[in-house]
């Protein structure tokens, strides 16, 4: 009976993960240097939207967001929510924004999976024509 319960719990966990493939911790890779920069935890909030919070910063773990605006100004980068207000639409996260802590700017965001990797596209325009992409790998 105990084995049956354990198997059911494992199947349920696998099913939940399969339903929400974006949720979890991702290692961010700098698109210019190719180096690992941080770990971001993507989660689904009670409001049904998806967010991403920096949980680890590999260089300067005590760094502050000195370029950020408003409530994010001078806040620790670890703990900062950089992926905001994303909605799951047709297998992609869309409609929200991404914060670049290096320059403090918010960009339109789109997130999708490709070959098991997360692709985050940050852009100046809603259509994603003017911007750049980063590839993140699951932790």
Predicted regions located by residue number:
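Central antiparallel beta-sheet cores of small beta-barrel/beta-sandwich binding domains
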Residues: 28-100, 106-107
